[in-house]
């Protein structure tokens, strides 16, 4: 019992010494990781936003046929399951090629 009190004091001092919070840890300017909607919109200028949207439209128009077929297959659950086993090309041919009239 006599050795318990000095041991508890020693443990408390060790915790205080190891858990000391220095001033350096408070120097971070990221007090809050979240930002307001107004500040979020200032990162990208309207011209850059317009350019990015235009590029996305161009990419959508110039997609390869295989990617368009895969997206159509992804939207249909049975086709997607079939594609996991036999591949997207075979799945698209099975579920969608007949509907378009091609053989």
UniProtKB/Swiss-Prot annotation:
Residues 51-97 form the Gla domain. GO terms for molecular function: calcium ion binding; calcium-dependent protein binding. Its main location: secreted. The modification Phosphoserine is found at residues 22, 25, 28. One of its GO terms (biological process) is regulation of bone mineralization. It is found in: Secreted. InterPro entries: GLA-like_dom_SF, GLA_domain, MGP, Osteocalcin/MGP. Keywords: Chondrogenesis, Developmental protein, Differentiation, Disulfide bond, Gamma-carboxyglutamic acid, Osteogenesis, Phosphoprotein, Secreted, Signal. The modification 4-carboxyglutamate is found at residues 21, 56, 60, 67, 71. One of its GO terms (cellular component) is extracellular matrix. Associates with the organic matrix of bone and cartilage. Thought to act as an inhibitor of bone formation. This is Matrix Gla protein. It comes from Rattus norvegicus. The gene is Mgp.
